[in-house]
């Protein structure tokens, strides 16, 4: 039992290190980043990479899936940090949103744009991740609906529509803020919060 547990932990650690390296390479070099570079950065062989993921497409999609889950977890934490909608401070909310993508928001946004380009250029991959994308929207919409209800507000538009807009625009706000040197998070959140009203009777 101990041997099996150790083997499983070792495989899990290998997978995590490979994903970390792949995320760095894909964000800095795009999908064109080579498997050799990823394996070297992780300190493993290409054989270990293939054993874990089977190929480049599967590795890239695994990186994106992990990144999306981090975003969802972070969003849930942001929503949980407020008790009432009336007490939501836009500046504080904007700061939390700014940190939502992690320590390197620009890299995270670049990775998401690379993923979008990958799907546009690879219809087969788009079909493979369609269910994952729907689940991301569904999960985010659920967080939004439950969070707004808990805060004592109501949505003026469907939660799923707002979720799609957030996913579609968040990376653009991040990159534009970085490239233009102007913080757009506050303005962005003012637009988002305009879709929230008082509780329904």
Which residue ranges define each predicted feature?
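Helix-turn-helix
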Residues: 13, 17, 21-58, 62
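Hydrophobic/aromatic-rich alpha-helical bundle segments in the mid-to-C-terminal region
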Residues: 126-130, 134, 148-201
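Amphipathic alpha-helical segments used for helix-helix packing
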Residues: 89-90, 103-127
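Short, solvent-exposed amphipathic helices
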Residues: 107, 128-135, 139-142
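Short, basic, alpha-helical segments at the C-terminal edge of helix-turn-helix-like DNA-binding modules
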Residues: 35, 65-71
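Short amphipathic alpha-helical elements of helix-turn-helix/winged-helix folds
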Residues: 21-25, 139, 169
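Hydrophobic alpha-helical connector segments
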Residues: 62-65, 75-109, 159-166
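N-terminal intrinsically disordered/low-complexity leader segments
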Residues: 1-13, 201
